[in-house]
Amino acid sequence: MSKLVEELKDEFDYIILDCPAGIEQGFKNAIAAADRALIVTTPEVSAIRDADRIIGLLEANDIHKIDLVINRIRMDMVERGDMLSKDDVLDILAVDLIGIVPDDENIVISTNQGEPLVGSNTPAGKAYQNICDRVMGKEVPFMEITGPTFFQRLAHVFKK
């Protein structure tokens, strides 16, 4: 894997390897060539535990540029105390935050339609674009993620 990545570096500015979450050989092969890591996790206790273990493995392999993406956060659940907040996750993992992606039904829709979501005018699409911009070194403010409004919840009830 390292040799392949070295060859690709001549052709591309960024090489992204999506590796398995576990500590098996596939993960070890992927991080062997890494100079940076983006940890993607959901704000659930078991996912945070896995992310913390992965961060430890990355640091043990001299990968210290580690950024975090919190995926599928739902502010209504955070406000009820049913989901960890952004601050809770950051306190536990102690790495830099590069993006927060709200839970968005458009993710499923775009995946099923084979359409990219990055750059679209959806909450998740905007969040993905912001992450891309931050990876490229741009200063982009974090989106404010809020729960559904009363009227959005009401509209959802009548859609059914």
Predicted ranges, named:
Residues 111-128:
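C-terminal boundary of histidine-terminating zinc-finger modules
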